[in-house]
């Protein structure tokens, strides 16, 4: 289960890992042993995508899209069709799923989706089993951690506030914080600036080709995770340090 993040943690200082190791459940022993023997790297800042990287919100996303699409007579898209749009903007996703290109209609779909999400999203979103331990270990190691997502920041915080202390993450950049969404590097570069980090010491972790392209455009290293609908083969087409399955 924890193999997804093995490569990411290869840069955590070994002495600090030993200090936090005893806070982690025994089932993660092999994970941390692997980390301790890995070659040291120079990352101090770890920025994550959210959906399909740290959390599985697919049930909530499918429910919200389905309710809006059905309301307007678009019943053909399957659940997998909807899941394949995760990581894109709402306007892009609705255009793909409905064929609609009119910006006013897409804006109305988005408005309806947000209203649906107020009811269905957070309650239908779960963190991946390793997420808490991975973020806690990084935090305890002294690394800077954050999230870069097309999802609204307040929506991400709704879930994280149930699991972490306030301001546990150093930064969350959501869809409302940027002018141009991923794969524009705007959000990623914004986080790097605000954290007073450098590109060379930053690793971006995500599950989609949108994330891979974002890292490439920002000029930062990328690690891919196949938690979602994107295959390892698709991710490998982009510069990467590691693709984890």
Named regions from a protein language model:
Residues 3-6:
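Intrinsic disorder
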């Amino acid at each position: 289960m924890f193999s997804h993040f093995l490569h990411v943690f290869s840069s955590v200082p070994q002495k600090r890992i030993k200090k936090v190791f005893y806070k982690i459940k025994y089932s993660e022993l092999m994970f941390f042993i692997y980390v301790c023997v890995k070659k040291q790297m120079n990352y101090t800042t770890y920025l994550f995508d959210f959906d399909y990287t740290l959390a599985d919100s697919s049930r909530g996303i499918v429910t919200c899209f389905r309710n809006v699409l059905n309301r307007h007579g678009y019943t053909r898209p399957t659940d997998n069709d909807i899941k394949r749009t995760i990581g894109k903007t709402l306007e892009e996703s609705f255009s793909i799923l409905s064929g609609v290109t009119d910006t006013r209609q897409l804006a109305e779909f988005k408005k309806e989706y947000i209203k649906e999400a107020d009811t269905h999203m957070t309650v239908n979103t779960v963190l991946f089993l390793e997420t808490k331990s991975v973020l806690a270990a990084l935090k305890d190691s002294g690394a800077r951690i954050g999230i870069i997502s097309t999802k609204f920041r307040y929506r991400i915080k709704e879930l994280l506030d149930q699991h972490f202390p306030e301001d546990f993450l150093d930064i969350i950049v959501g869809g409302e914080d940027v002018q141009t969404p991923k794969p524009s590097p705007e959000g990623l570069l914004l986080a790097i600036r605000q954290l007073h980090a450098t590109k060379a010491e930053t690793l971006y972790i995500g599950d989609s080709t949108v994330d891979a392209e974002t890292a490439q455009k920002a000029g930062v290293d990328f690690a891919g995770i196949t938690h979602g609908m994107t295959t390892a083969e698709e991710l490998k087409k982009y510069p990467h340090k590691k693709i984890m399955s």
